[in-house]
Amino acid sequence: MSVFTEIFSHCKRMFFRLKEAFPQYHILAQVAFSALITNSNLKIRARFNRKVTDFVLLDKNLKVIMIVELDDPSHIGKEVEDAQRDAMLYEAGYRVKRYTEIPSIETLKKDIH
C-alpha cells in the first residue's frame, strides 16, 4: 500500500467515525481555509490561500460546529506550523480539535460537545 493510499484510507476511516458519532451534522472533508475565512487584504489572504482543513462539522443550519484535524506522521516536526494554522481559525471564531489517531466515538462526543 502506498503512503498516499494509507493516508487517504486513514482520513476515510475518520470521516466515517465522525458520521457515526454525529449523524445530526453534515461532515465536510478537505475544506479550503478561504471557504471559512475572508479578508480583503491580499497580504493577509496569502497567509491562508492554499491551506485546507481536514474536516468541518456543520449543524442543520450550516453553522460551523467544529473543525477537526487528523494529524498523520507527516505532521511530526510541524507543530509550530499547525499552531499557526489553528490560531488563524481561532481568530476567525472557530473551534479546532486535533487528533493524532482516530478517536473513539465517546472521545469525539466528549471533545466536540
Please state what every model-predicted region is.
Residues 1-41:
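Solvent-exposed, charged helical/coil patches
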Residues 18, 55-57, 66-70, 89:
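Conserved catalytic cores of phosphodiester-cleaving nucleases, focusing on short active-site segments
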Residues 29-63:
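Active-site metal-binding core of divalent-cation-utilizing nuclease and nuclease-like domains
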Residues 48, 75-82:
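Active-site-adjacent loop/helix micro-motif of nuclease/hydrolase catalytic cores
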Residues 60, 87-95:
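Arginine/glycine-rich "motif VI" loop of SF2 helicases in the C-terminal RecA-like domain
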Residues 60, 73-75:
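Short coil/turn motifs at secondary-structure junctions
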Residues 67-71, 97-100:
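Acidic beta-strand-to-loop metal/phosphate-binding motif
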Residues 93-113:
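Basic, glycine-rich
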